[in-house]
């Protein structure tokens, strides 16, 4: 089963974005730093990451988790999805693949 694991918003001003989601929206802040902030939202994580030239402010990345990443990758490619990164072991120790959805949002998929 495909599960929504996280949503990352790329932000132009980390402090302003943290204040908005913490003080206005009311999400409990789990962690805050200059390069990453994270909120408690139940089973799904909301993360804030500094914007860059590639990931401009307001752009969103969606994170999915699947039980079998290689099988998911093969199924999605058979349906015409073009991956920007095939399944690859990451520095943090997890396996990850990436593609863009029909609207241009980045989607990262983790799994075994």
Q: What residue spans do the PLM features occupy?
A:
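Helix N-cap motif at beta-to-alpha junctions
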Residues: 13-14, 67-69
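Short secondary-structure junctions
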Residues: 26-31, 84-86
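Vicinal oxygen chelate
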Residues: 73-74, 79-112
């Amino acid at each position: 089963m495909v599960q929504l694991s996280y949503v990352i918003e790329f932000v132009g001003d980390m402090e302003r974005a943290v204040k908005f989601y913490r003080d206005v929206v009311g999400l409990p802040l789990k962690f805050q730093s200059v390069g990453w902030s994270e909120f408690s939202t139940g089973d799904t994580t909301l993360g804030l990451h500094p914007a860059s030239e590639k990931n401009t402010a307001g752009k969103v990345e969606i994170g999915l988790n699947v039980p079998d990443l290689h099988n998911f990758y093969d199924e999605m490619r058979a349906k015409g999805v073009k991956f920007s990164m095939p399944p690859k072991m990451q520095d943090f120790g997890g396996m990850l693949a990436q593609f863009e959805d029909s609207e241009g949002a980045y989607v990262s998929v983790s799994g075994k």
